[in-house]
């Protein structure tokens, strides 16, 4: 095993708090269509300060993908409070993972790989959210068989070792995932989703408690209300797909990798995405079709970045 590698011992499970928080963000993440397993007893890796949102040397081109404006509902939840709460919860998650032997080794090759990719994407983040200039970005690689990744508000990113090991991703494909997760934070999907749950009467008490926002309501969710929320979530996922595609292209990563990524994801998930109207995320074929149709729109950005 190389320095900073992973010990493969008996299984260990994170506390209910840790699993719940990761589960909450997984439900907002495009990767949760894929089957996953519990945390194994193994050492993970930590990468702190993945890079800063530096100003580009040249004036960036206008956005090439069409996703419209961010939801005005997000204004019901103060961005500063949500980002501060996320930073606090993120630190707790890292401490919990470390206590379970699932964290930290800056010298690992996979961690350095994520560092390189993040440094190429982060400078383009402010185009989608000016607050990103102030964020203290972090990227962590955590020992888990889960095929997943997420980005909390404020730029707190986590990758699971399972997604890198099981899918054998290229750098371009990793960039598509990272761009997608960054897009969730930049487009403030969590902020808007929490606000919408309050407005529609859907209770997200788990998210509220974990993010330190207090009670958002006392009405139990029913099937009808939940279906309304699912529609909103599917829109978020499509939005993040396209913004992430553009972020990765601007960073010099081949946009065609978004298609190959989802082909791998469909295979890993057994090809079962469920009925579209009940899914919290677009099905594999739907995603691939939409991404493929948008690849030409960002091809020029990719070529410019590579020149």
Regions found by a protein language model. Give the residues of each.
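A Zn2+-metalloprotease active-site environment signal
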Residues: 5-7, 13-307
């Amino acid at each position: 095993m190389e320095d900073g590698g992973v010990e493969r011992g008996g299984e260990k499970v994170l506390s209910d708090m840790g699993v719940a928080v990761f589960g909450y963000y997984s439900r907002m993440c495009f990767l949760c269509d894929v089957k996953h397993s519990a945390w194994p007893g193994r050492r993970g890796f930590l990468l702190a300060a993945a890079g800063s949102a530096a100003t580009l040397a040249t004036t960036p081109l206008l956005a090439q993908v069409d996703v419209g404006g961010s939801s005005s509902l997000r204004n019901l939840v103060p961005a500063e409070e949500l980002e501060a709460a996320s930073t606090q919860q993120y630190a707790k998650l890292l401490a919990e993972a470390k206590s379970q032997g699932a964290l930290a080794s800056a010298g690992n090759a996979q961690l350095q790989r994520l560092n390189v990719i993040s440094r190429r994407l982060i400078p383009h983040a402010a185009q989608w959210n000016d607050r990103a200039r102030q964020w203290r970005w972090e990227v962590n690689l955590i020992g888990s068989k889960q095929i997943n990744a997420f980005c909390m508000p404020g730029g707190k990113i986590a990758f699971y070792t399972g997604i890198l090991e099981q899918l054998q991703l290229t750098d371009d494909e990793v960039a598509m995932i990272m761009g997608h997760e960054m897009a969730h934070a930049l487009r403030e999907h969590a902020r808007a989703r929490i606000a919408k749950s309050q407005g529609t009467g859907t209770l997200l008490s788990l998210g509220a408690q974990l993010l330190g926002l207090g009670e958002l309501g006392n009405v139990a969710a029913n099937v009808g209300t939940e279906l309304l929320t699912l529609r909103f979530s599917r829109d978020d996922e499509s939005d993040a797909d396209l913004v992430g595609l553009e972020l990765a292209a601007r960073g010099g990563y081949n946009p065609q990798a978004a298609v190959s990524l989802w082909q791998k994801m469909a295979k890993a998930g057994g090809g079962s995405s469920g009925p579209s109207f009940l899914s919290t995320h677009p099905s594999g074929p739907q995603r691939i079709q939409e991404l493929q149709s948008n690849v030409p729109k960002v091809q020029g950005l990719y070529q410019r970045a590579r020149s």
